[in-house]
From Swiss-Prot:
The lineage of its organism: Bacteria, Pseudomonadati, Pseudomonadota, Gammaproteobacteria, Pasteurellales. GTP binds at residues 13-19, 41-43, 306, 332-334, 415-417. It is found in: Cytoplasm. GO terms for cellular component: cytoplasm. Substrate binds at A300, V301, T302, G303, R304, P305, R306. It holds the Pfam family Adenylsucc_synt. IMP binds at D14, E15, G16, K17, N39, A40, G41, H42, T130, R144, Q225, T240, R304. GO terms for molecular function: adenylosuccinate synthase activity; GTP binding; magnesium ion binding. Pathway: Purine metabolism; AMP biosynthesis via de novo pathway; AMP from IMP: step 1/2. Binds 1 Mg(2+) ion per subunit. Keywords: Cytoplasm, GTP-binding, Ligase, Magnesium, Metal-binding, Nucleotide-binding, Purine biosynthesis. This is Adenylosuccinate synthetase. Mg(2+) binds at D14, G41. It comes from Glaesserella parasuis serovar 5 (strain SH0165).
Length: 432
C-alpha cells in the first residue's frame, strides 16, 4: 500500500521545505503543489549546485517523478515559462513530467499591477506581499470573474473575457491608483504565445491522484509558505492568500483528507519571518543579527532580509492543532552553533496578563504580547554536516529533546546543512 505524505511549513515559511521534499522524492512517484503560486522560493542544493523553484514542484529534479500542479495553485504563464526554460537549459525534462489542473486560476499582468498599486497606496501599513499578483488572482477566483487554464482551450471566449476583466482593472488602476493601464493586446498576445505549451500539460489531477493511491504509489504533497501565513489560521491580515495548512490539500488537489497518512511539519531551530506582521520572539539585538548572518536569512524569491528570533513553541503548537502534524523536520540546527545560551518561547503573556500556550489568531490580538522563555545552555561544538545523532553535542541533543517535550511531537528528521546528504532521517515518514 502506498503512502501519502504532506510536507508543510509550521512557522512563517522559509523553513527549508524544498530540501526535504527533494530528499524524500526518491521514495515517491508523484509530487504535488496544491496552493500558492510563484511567490514562494524553494531552494535546493544538490552536489553543491543551487536551484530555486518557485512554481514547479521540487520533485522535478528526480527523473522518475511526475510533478502535479493542483487547482489550488494560481498559475502565472510567464513565471512557468521562465522556470521551465531554466530547467530545460540544464537538460531536465519538464514537459513530459509536469501535469497541470485545468482549474488553476491564471495570474496575468493586471494582477501584478494591482498588487504593486495597492502596496504603494498602503505605505507604512502595507501587508508586505511579494508583488507577484497572488492576492488579486485569488480574489478573482473567489469573485468568479477569473480566467483559468481551461479558458485557454477557447481563445475567442478567452479574448472576450479578458477584455471585460481589463476594463474592470484598468478603471481602478487609472482612476483610483493613478497608475498606467495594462495593455489588452500585449496581454492577449503574450498568453496566446504560450497557451499550447500549457494546455499540452493539462490533466485531471484529482483522478490521477486517486488512481495513484489505488495502484499503491507513494505521493508527496509540497506545501508553500507556512502555517502562520494561512489566510484563515494565520496572523490575519498579515498573511498570504491561500490555505497553507493541511486542509488546503483536499481543496487544492481533490485528494480527500482521510487519504493522508502522515503530515511532516518543517521547523527551523529558531524562527524567521519576512514582511510585516506579529513576531513575538523577534530579536533586535546582535544575537538576531548573528542568526540572520549565519543562516543567510534572505528571501529566495524577493531577496528581502528575514526577521529573526528565538524558537516560538506557542506558534508551533497552533500549527500542530491545525495540521494534525505527525512529526517534525528541524532545519538549520547548525546556525545555533557557538551561542552561549538559547531560548525557547513556551508561553505568551497577553496584554491583560493572561498566560496562554497557543497563539492568537487575529494580528490585533498579538498587540502587547510578551514571550515567556525557557533558557537552555548552548554549545561551542560544530553541528554543520553532522549526519549521526550521537555525534551531536549533548547540549544540541538536549535542545532538540526539550522542543519535542514542549510540543509533544517528535523530531523525525534533522537537517544540519543545505545539501540533501546533510540530513538525519530518524523516522522515515513513508515507513511510519
Amino acid at each position: 500500500m502506498g503512502k501519502s505524505v504532506a510536507i508543510l511549513g509550521a512557522q512563517w515559511g522559509d523553513e527549508g521545505k524544498g530540501k526535504i521534499v527533494d530528499l524524500l522524492t526518491d521514495r515517491v512517484k508523484y509530487v504535488v503543489r496544491y496552493q500558492g503560486g510563484h511567490n514562494a522560493g524553494h531552494t535546493l542544493i544538490i552536489n553543491g549546485e543551487k536551484t530555486v523553484l518557485r512554481l514547479i514542484p521540487s520533485g522535478i529534479l528526480r527523473e522518475n517523478v511526475t510533478c502535479l500542479i493542483g487547482n489550488g495553485v494560481v498559475l502565472s504563464p510567464a513565471a512557468l515559462m521562465q522556470e521551465m526554460g531554466e530547467l530545460e537549459s540544464r537538460g531536465i525534462n519538464v514537459r513530459d513530467r509536469l501535469k497541470i489542473s485545468e482549474a488553476c486560476p491564471l495570474i496575468l499582468p493586471y494582477h501584478v499591477a494591482m498588487d504593486h498599486a495597492r502596496e504603494a497606496a498602503l505605505g507604512k501599513n502595507k501587508i508586505g506581499t511579494t508583488g507577484r499578483g497572488i492576492g488579486p488572482a485569488y480574489e478573482d477566483k473567489v469573485s468568479r470573474r477569473g480566467l483559468r487554464v481551461s479558458d485557454l482551450f477557447n481563445r475567442e471566449a478567452f479574448a472576450e473575457k479578458l477584455k471585460t476583466i481589463l476594463e474592470y482593472y484598468n478603471f481602478q488602476l487609472v482612476h483610483y491608483y493613478k497608475v498606467e493601464p495594462v495593455d489588452y493586446q500585449k496581454t492577449l498576445d503574450d498568453v496566446f504565445a504560450v497557451a499550447d505549451i500549457i494546455t499540452g500539460m493539462v490533466a485531471d489531477i484529482t483522478t490521477l491522484l486517486h488512481k495513484a493511491r489505488a495502484n499503491g504509489d507513494n505521493i508527496l504533497f509540497e506545501g508553500a509558505q507556512g502555517t502562520m501565513l494561512d489566510i484563515d489560521h494565520g496572523t490575519y491580515p498579515f498573511v498570504t492568500s491561500s490555505n497553507t495548512t493541511a486542509g488546503g490539500i483536499a481543496t487544492g488537489s481533490g485528494f480527500g483528507p482521510r487519504n493522508l497518512d502522515y503530515v511532516l511539519g518543517i521547523i527551523k531551530a529558531y524562527c524567521t519571518r519576512v514582511g510585516s506582521g506579529p513576531f513575538t520572539t523577534e530579536l533586535f539585538d546582535e544575537v538576531g543579527a548573528e542568526i540572520a548572518r549565519k543562516g543567510n536569512e534572505f528571501g529566495a524569491v524577493t531577496g528581502r532580509p528575514r526577521r529573526c528570533g528565538w524558537f516560538d513553541a506557542v506558534a508551533v503548537r497552533r500549527a500542530i492543532q491545525i495540521n494534525s502534524i505527525s512529526g517534525f523536520c528541524m532545519t538549520k540546527l547548525d546556525v545555533l552553533d557557538g551561542f552561549e545560551e538559547l531560548k525557547i518561547c513556551v508561553a505568551y503573556k497577553l496584554q491583560n496578563g493572561e498566560i496562554v500556550e497557543y497563539s492568537p489568531l487575529a494580528a490585533a490580538n498579538w498587540e502587547g504580547v510578551e514571550p515567556i522563555y525557557e533558557t537552555l545552555p548552548g554549545w561551542k561544538e560544530n553541528t554543520f554536516r553532522v549526519t549521526k545523532l550521537e555525534d551531536l553535542p549533548q547540549n544540541a541533543i538536549n535542545y532538540i529533546k526539550r522542543i519535542e517535550e514542549v510540543l509533544g511531537v517528535p523530531v523525525d528528521i534533522l537537517s544540519t546543512g543545505p545539501d540533501r546528504v546533510e540530513t538525519m532521517i530518524l523516522r522515515d515518514p513513508f515507513a511510519a
